[in-house]
Curated annotation (Swiss-Prot):
The keyword Kinase does not apply. PANTHER family: LATE EMBRYOGENESIS ABUNDANT PROTEIN 47, SEED MATURATION FAMILY PROTEIN. A motif (Nuclear localization signal (NLS)) lies at residues 5-9. InterPro entries: LEA_SMP, LEA_SMP_dom. It comes from the Eukaryota. Residues 146-174 are annotated as: Disordered. It comes from Arabidopsis thaliana (Mouse-ear cress). Residues 147-158 have a biased composition (Basic and acidic residues). This is Late embryogenesis abundant protein 47. Belongs to the LEA type SMP family. Keywords: Cytoplasm, Nucleus, Repeat. LEA proteins are late embryonic proteins abundant in higher plant seed embryos. The function of those proteins is not known. It is found in: Cytoplasm; Nucleus. Residues 68-125, 133-190 form the SMP domain.
């Protein structure tokens, strides 16, 4: 392959064009079939025929029907603990949840975890609870703020709970907070 071909994105028309260039050295029939990738090609002598199967791409294959996603569990925390000011333990739990939902190891600028960290930093400097940023401020619409989402599992719940506990001065979780919501979602999903 040339350097230009390596940097050029693959187009369906190019695949058929490349299939026409296939030649056989023995003059026999060669067939290449890879239905998983959507390409079927056959060559006989100097002639080649190719077919490209168009597949529909599912927007989010990890999210299945009838299960509760991590993003939805974060939104449920708004209903149970929405008036709670965001603390470091909450920010850590939200970050762990975002990492598990998206599969990324770092947090996204402007994402749910970044907002939670900013809120926790700001809240640590403010004396009055009345003016502090709450979980409702950070987590409302969380599932739409995540670039990808997946069904909550027991491993996800354990990771989020561990993050919240490690960052709490008393090594506990808030009873109706972020970790509790993800754990409840995982229990519901496991029973299905």
């Amino acid at each position: 392959m040339s350097e230009e071909q390596l940097q050029k994105p693959i187009d369906c028309a190019d695949v058929k064009g490349e299939a026409e260039k296939i030649s056989t050295t023995e003059g026999g029939i060669k067939a290449a079939e890879d239905k998983e990738k959507g390409v079927v090609a056959e060559a006989s002598g100097e002639q080649a025929e190719g077919e490209v199967n168009q597949k529909k791409v599912v927007a989010n294959p990890l999210k299945s029907e009838g299960t509760i996603t991590i993003g939805e569990a974060l939104e449920a925390a708004v209903l149970t603990a929405g008036n709670k000011p965001v603390e470091w333990s909450d920010a850590a739990a939200i970050q762990a949840a975002e990492v598990r939902a998206t599969g990324r190891t770092n947090i996204m600028p402007g994402g749910v975890a970044a907002s939670a960290q900013s809120a926790a930093t700001l809240n640590a400097r403010i004396g009055s609870d009345d003016t502090k940023t709450t979980l409702a401020d950070v987590l409302t619409g969380a599932s739409s703020k995540l670039p990808s989402d997946k069904a909550a599992t027991r491993k996800d719940a354990e990771g989020v709970t561990g993050a919240e506990m490690r960052n709490d001065p008393h090594l506990t979780t808030y009873p109706t907070g972020v970790a509790a919501s993800v754990a409840a979602a995982a229990r519901i999903n496991q029973s299905k």
